């Protein structure tokens, strides 16, 4: 008689039990979970794995777009996750209609959360009370008055971009405008944040900090994807390569050192953010050193990515739509005799320029996916639909902005849809669906500055050059996305406009 080995029975039993557990969990998620009433593919409702794979591949944005086109305004994209493109629901998510009832951020999704040993948090990761205090301190740095004081800096780097782009195009026959807009926006914001430029436009080369930012952002997107699984925080941290951890800390130290050097100068006449913050500190209302460090990294990334992405996209979209380019160029060149006349006061009245910027933000939102919010124990309501506690909810920007339910010819670039009286074809467009800077009490503090920067950059650039898209960049806009679009080089040829003297 053969000897009985318990392991011969235990192993199949264990496998069967584990398989049974996952099967029962999947069945519960699909048919009995509180979110089962929302439409979406059953595979996504059953398990976190499908959407996680899409996120790790950079395909979340395209996936959300396809799912909303098929299932409508609300789509269940994972067992406990809901994506919406409903404009009214977006106001509930962000607290635009009632700030007290906004759904809190899902801090598991933010890699900057709890990154410092002292527990310091910045605007991005602070709870609502701390966010209100910090935002009140920073708000004067983004006011109209502050922007007027910063205008000489903005003009300085805009003029330098125009000059350097022309030199590069003449030398190589083409120039990468993604690189140029990155250099200009980082130099300007660094001067505002640290009181000194990074000198990227002068040297015409990436420094290690800027060269690695895309890798850091991609890392944070992947970390968010993995952390959506229970108990994966510690496991993920152990799997992070030492080289990636080192780069992350180098980024933190780079910003900290720049802030420390700036603070040594105390209050100055230089129109940067910290002069205003230090004045608040003198009144006993300011930030701790840790809060200054934490926010400096945020400003140097978030405040540059929006404008750089928008400018790159606008350059591409205008080149691909020569009739729109001509209309904009005629407006700019017909209004100004020189670029010196272009200011933060003289540019806002240009209607078609503003319409192009708004349409650029719609077609190519800088943050195309959804920034997650997590429902508290009290539950929440989205446009009359009840959500259970712990639900993660997104407003899917790209999917909403490219929805045929919201816009006529949604995938095409038509600035005219933003006219005060739009053509009849676009009269029923749902322009309220477009909120690229978010909404509510935690909307982007720098949106006013971003608009002024975009107007000045685009106006001076197109006043000076005729722009021709290179063949190798014809499909530039087809991109992966890890929180932001993964931008490839955008090569154009620049032809300086010759004017009669």
From Swiss-Prot:
CDD domains: CYP60B-like (cd11058). InterPro entries: Cyt_P450, Cyt_P450_CS, Cyt_P450_E_grp-I, Cyt_P450_sf, Cytochrome_P450_monoxygenase. It is found in: Membrane. Pfam families: p450. Its main location: membrane. GO terms for cellular component: membrane. Pathway: Secondary metabolite biosynthesis. Its cofactor is heme. GO terms for biological process: biosynthetic process. GO terms for molecular function: heme binding; iron ion binding; monooxygenase activity; oxidoreductase activity, acting on paired donors, with incorporation or reduction of molecular oxygen. It is a single-pass membrane protein. The keyword Transmembrane helix applies. Glycans are attached at residue 212. Belongs to the cytochrome P450 family. Cytochrome P450 monooxygenase; part of the gene cluster that mediates the biosynthesis of radicicol, a resorcylic acid lactone (RAL) that irreversibly inhibits the HSP90 molecular chaperone, an important target for cancer chemotherapy. The cluster encodes only two apparent post-PKS enzymes, a cytochrome P450 monooxygenase (radP) and a non-heme halogenase (radH) that introduce the epoxide and the chlorine, respectively. If this cluster includes all the genes required for radicicol biosynthesis, the remaining structural features of radicicol are presumably generated by the PKSs rads1 and rads2. This is Cytochrome P450 monooxygenase radP. It comes from Floropilus chiversii. The gene is radP.
